Amino acid sequence: MKRTLSFITLFALLLTACVGEDGPPGQDGELAPSFEVGNVNFLPSNNYSVREDYGFEVFPTEVTLAYILWDDNSGQANDIWRLLPQTVIFDDGNDLVYNYEFTQTHVDFFLEGSNLGLLGGEWTQNQVFRVVVVPATQVNGVDTSNINTVIALGDIQNFEVR
């Protein structure tokens, strides 16, 4: 009995001490690649649309989130980032939508509205956007409208300014 117990103990020790081969190496890189695009101008000549290439690989299982820097008219230096699309309804009944679409190679920012030609420069000139690419499985149940939540989720240290 003592010999059997010793054999089982030795066998268990050897079995748990074994090490298998290492698995394949994972991909290096950021958890959530991100960048900022400044001085975006929406003009009739560019059909109120601007394209920005990612400059990095985006996989079919990832989604792009885009945010616009919003002026809160408070006179304070508050950065307010709103998730696109964003809609503005003017007093005269006209409307404006800041929108975007994305592929695996680029993101397009564009304006939609009932009469874009009437918009002042404050709505079409020098707009600033932030883009974050995240795995689709990570955004389920996450408040993506809050850029700070997305920054924490993706462990984003800073946004590359383009």
Task: Describe each model-derived feature in a short phrase.
Residues 1-4:
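Positively charged n-region of N-terminal signal peptides that target proteins for export
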Residues 9-12:
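Hydrophobic helical h-region of N-terminal Sec-dependent signal peptides
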Residues 14-17:
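C-terminal motif of bacterial Sec signal peptides marking the signal peptidase cleavage site
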Residues 20-35:
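Collagen/collagen-like triple-helix recognition
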Residues 30-32, 45-51, 128:
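Intrinsic-disorder/low-complexity, polar/charged segments enriched in Ser/Thr/Lys/Arg/Asp/Glu/Gln
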Residues 32-43, 140-145:
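Disulfide-bonded cysteine-rich modules in secreted/extracellular proteins
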Residues 37-120:
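Extracellular attachment/recognition segments
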Residues 124-162:
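C-terminal partner/receptor-binding element of secreted or periplasmic proteins
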